[in-house]
């Protein structure tokens, strides 16, 4: 045994200071109590701030998490022809909508939906574009045009995707596709430029809940009328984003429907006539320049663009050498050729350059004064002694070379601008070129070269630097018919509403005021003889017509010949052949239509374009117009047409 360890082990507890321990405990208790009191004070202060001071703020935030404002897109206005025939409608489809911000794994979800609803790469690409432009927590169309099978498959699997929902939506549909494409244009998905423009014009809010906007044609020009006004629903949602109840709403206001001046039956008839050809036909009512028909071929199906055209289809249209996307009626710029001789005749008489009796000898060419340069007439042997009437009737180039030389380019170009050349016509289609009426300033700016007299001579027969669209030639013809009265070519007949709103001419351009009424009559008499005189260039095409016609042919050269070079069509590529023109009006004493025809690379105007114009006039004056006048149907303001309207439209 270790005695030292035994004796050193204490046998009792050390002394404790009870008072000190009590004081320490009291201090700790006080600190703890003060801490609890402080924290309780902070807690109640925050509760006071939340419940009393900032009650409105946090209530708004709370409501924002469970109350949403859902846009109600309006139904787009319909489009009818002049007799109430439906041209553009809205069809109901079902689409799969997604709220990306409420989707846990977006990439995985998109991948899984490929198998459930047939989601394609194109669908995903369109969705991503819309997401970049859209507002957060707003449903975005992911998969359009769902089939019944796809809807059923999603119904089975939908519980896995609380942020997705199948909803109905309206989709634009064009009933006559290629026949009306260049007039109606189409609606398509908004792009960044559209969004920027809408925001700049303070219209973007009205497009909440819709991705469609008018892109071309009438759909674009009358977008504000057709679009309507977006409504809204204030709804309460649960934690899964599902609507529990609707708190209040403001219904959307549907877009207004519009009636065009187009006669669908005439439009379809002309489309059939132009089948397989490259060209255009414009038909105007000379009383007010309303467009009865405007056809450009080849054309395209505008329904392809509504949901976003596929890259394959778009490449096919772009690479088509026949250029189906290009409206030859409003964008085709061709030398107007001899169709302009009657207009020049009016100008030259008014400027006292010629009178109806002014006569020159036409040997088949014209020589520029103080020069050896010859300008050839289309008729190699010439026309002999030629006055104004004969010059128009036989289309003497030599006569109008002399007229152009005497007038000079300044007066000539100014007058042709009065007839509407070198500027937009004012029609409600933005896809229109101004073409070109040349001036000294234009050539200097374009080619850095001064104007020379030889340039003026070519302009005198509608060649050289002068280009025009078929619509411009048709407009100029109506101005001639009306002795200088200028009406704007237009496609709008009326807008539906509480009261039908008829079209009002914006009067973009002034009338041609000339005291010489005889100048107009002399030009029109020449056009009458083109078709009716034995020596008229268009006589053959209108032989035995049961109505009186006045017209003018034109043959537009695609390239210039050298002085002694002969024109040989057999050795030329098709695209180098002349363009065929013909513009006419009928009946002569009481005009009811103006018809202008251009056929690309078809050859002479009198032998190719004039017969087609004859068919159009025969159909309209002998068949269509009597049918319309018999029923005399007013514009229909309802979608379901009357029996008479159905009969008028050939159904």
Curated annotation (Swiss-Prot):
Q: Which UniProt keywords apply?
A: Carboxypeptidase, Cell inner membrane, Cell membrane, Cell shape, Cell wall biogenesis/degradation, Hydrolase, Membrane, Peptidoglycan synthesis, Protease, Transmembrane, Transmembrane helix
Specify the pathway.
Answer: Cell wall biogenesis; peptidoglycan biosynthesis
Q: What is its EC number?
A: 3.4.16.4
Q: State which residue ranges cross the membrane.
A: 30-50
Q: Which GO terms describe its biological process?
A: cell wall organization; peptidoglycan biosynthetic process; proteolysis; regulation of cell shape
Which Pfam families has this protein been placed in? PBP_dimer (PF03717), Transpeptidase (PF00905)
Q: What is its main location?
A: membrane
Q: What InterPro entries is this protein classified in? A: Bact_Transpept/Beta-Lactamase, Beta-lactam/transpept-like, PBP_dimer, PBP_dimer_sf, PCN-bd_Tpept, Penicillin-binding_protein_2
Q: Where in the cell is it found?
A: Cell inner membrane
What domain of life?
A: Bacteria
Catalytic site: 338 (acyl-ester intermediate)
Membrane topology classification: Single-pass membrane protein
Catalytic activity of the protein: Preferential cleavage: (Ac)2-L-Lys-D-Ala-|-D-Ala. Also transpeptidation of peptidyl-alanyl moieties that are N-acyl substituents of D-alanine
Gene Ontology MF terms: penicillin binding; peptidoglycan L,D-transpeptidase activity; serine-type D-Ala-D-Ala carboxypeptidase activity
Question: From which residue to which does the signal peptide run?
Answer: none
Give a Gene Ontology cellular component term annotated to this protein. Answer: plasma membrane
Which enzyme class? hydrolase
Record remark on domains: Has a penicillin insensitive transglycosylase domain (formation of linear glycan strands) and a penicillin-sensitive transpeptidase domain (cross-linking of the peptide subunits).
Q: Which family does it belong to?
A: Belongs to the transpeptidase family. MrdA subfamily.
Function per UniProt: Catalyzes cross-linking of the peptidoglycan cell wall.
Task: Give the protein's recorded name.
Answer: Peptidoglycan D,D-transpeptidase MrdA
- Which organism does this record belong to? Haemophilus influenzae (strain ATCC 51907 / DSM 11121 / KW20 / Rd)
């Amino acid at each position: 045994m270790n005695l030292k360890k035994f004796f050193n082990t204490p046998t009792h507890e050390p002394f404790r200071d009870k008072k000190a321990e009590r004081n320490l405990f009291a201090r700790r208790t006080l600190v703890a109590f003060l801490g609890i009191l402080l924290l309780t004070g902070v807690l109640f202060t925050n509760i006071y701030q939340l419940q009393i001071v900032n009650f409105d703020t946090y209530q708004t935030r709370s409501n924002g998490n469970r109350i949403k404002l859902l846009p109600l897109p309006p139904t787009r206005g319909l489009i009818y022809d002049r007799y109430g025939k439906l041209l553009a409608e809205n069809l109901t489809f079902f689409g799969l909508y997604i709220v990306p911000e409420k989707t846990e794994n977006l990439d995985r979800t998109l991948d899984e939906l490929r198998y459930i609803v047939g989601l394609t790469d194109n669908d995903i690409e369109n969705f991503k574009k819309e997401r970049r432009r859209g507002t957060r927590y707003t449903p975005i169309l992911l998969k359009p045009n769902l089939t019944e099978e796809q809807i059923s498959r999603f119904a089975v699997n939908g519980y896995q995707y609380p942020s997705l929902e199948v909803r109905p939506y309206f989709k634009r549909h064009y009933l006559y596709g290629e026949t009306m494409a260049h007039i109606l244009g189409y609606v398509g998905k908004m792009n960044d430029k559209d969004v920027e423009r809408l925001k700049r014009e303070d219209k973007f809010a009205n497009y909440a809940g819709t991705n469609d906007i008018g892109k071309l044609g009438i759909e674009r020009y009358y977008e504000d009328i057709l679009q309507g006004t977006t409504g809204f629903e204030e709804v309460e949602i649960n934690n899964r984003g599902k609507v529990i109840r609707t708190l209040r709403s403001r219904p959307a206001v549907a877009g207004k429907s519009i009636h065009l001046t187009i006669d669908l039956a005439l439009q379809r008839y002309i489309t059939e006539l132009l089948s397989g050809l490259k060209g255009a036909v414009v038909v105007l009512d000379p009383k007010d320049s309303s467009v009865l028909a405007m056809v450009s071929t080849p054309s395209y199906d505008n329904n392809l663009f509504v949901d976003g055209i596929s890259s394959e289809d778009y490449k096919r249209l772009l690479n088509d050498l026949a250029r189906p996307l290009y409206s030859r009626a409003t964008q085709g710029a061709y030398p107007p050729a001899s169709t302009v001789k009657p207009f020049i005749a009016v100008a030259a008489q008014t400027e006292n350059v010629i009178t109806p009796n002014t006569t020159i000898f036409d040997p088949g060419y014209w020589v520029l004064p103080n020069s050896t340069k010859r300008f050839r007439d289309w008729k190699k042997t010439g026309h002999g002694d030629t006055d104004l009437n004969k010059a128009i009737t036989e289309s003497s180039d030599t006569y109008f070379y002399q007229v152009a030389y005497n007038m000079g380019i300044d007066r000539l170009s100014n007058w042709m601008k009065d007839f509407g050349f070198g500027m937009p016509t004012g029609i409600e289609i933005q896809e229109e070129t101004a073409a070109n009426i040349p001036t000294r300033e234009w050539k200097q700016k374009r080619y850095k070269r001064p104007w020379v007299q030889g340039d003026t001579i070519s302009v005198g027969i509608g060649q050289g630097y002068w280009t025009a669209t078929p619509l411009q030639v048709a407009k100029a013809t109506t101005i001639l018919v009306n002795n200088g009265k200028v009406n704007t070519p237009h496609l709008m007949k009326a807008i539906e509403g509480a009261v039908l709103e008829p079209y009002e001419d914006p009067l973009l351009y002034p009338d041609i005021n000339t005291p010489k009424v005889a100048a107009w009559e002399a030009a029109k008499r020449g056009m009458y003889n083109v078709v009716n005189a034995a020596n008229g260039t268009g006589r053959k095409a209108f032989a035995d017509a049961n109505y009186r016609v006045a017209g003018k042919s034109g043959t537009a050269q695609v390239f210039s010949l050298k002085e002694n070079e002969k024109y040989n069509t057999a050795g030329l590529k098709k695209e180098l052949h002349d363009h065929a023109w013909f513009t006419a009006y009928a009946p002569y004493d009481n005009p009811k239509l103006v018809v202008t025809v251009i056929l690309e690379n078809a050859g002479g105007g009198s032998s190719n374009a004039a017969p087609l114009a004859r068919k159009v006039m025969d159909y309209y004056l002998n068949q269509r117009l009597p049918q319309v006048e018999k029923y005399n149907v007013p514009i229909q303001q309802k979608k379901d047409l009357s029996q008479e309207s159905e009969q008028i439209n050939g159904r």
